[in-house]
Amino acid sequence: MRSVRDDRAVRTVVAKVAHDISARPPLRLDVGQQVDVGDRDTEWPEFVFVTASQGSGWVPARHLSASSGTAVVVTTYDTTELPTQVGDVLEVVVEDLTSGWLWCRSSEGREGWVPVKTLEAR
């Protein structure tokens, strides 16, 4: 998987369904950081809820050393989501099809994760 900060777009997509973001502030986890792992998400089974010193959020379990109890972050991860409206054209920067989300960039330059199921090829 590419770094989230990579400026090259993989492809262009269009939002077919609006995506609203959660009210929870984004969480950035760094390699080596310790987190407490909670429940697995029922809608997105690749994700587990984690609590870190700076907040909490949903993270793909593969970025952690364990999927329950206390774990160490093995891959840097940023939970920032990108809100979309129907018809928004987005550049895909990172494809994470295992989790069902894409890291996208809007025409205004904002970036974040968007669910694949809300997008279609352009």
What does each model-found stretch correspond to?
Residues 1-122:
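Src homology 3 (SH3)-mediated interaction modules
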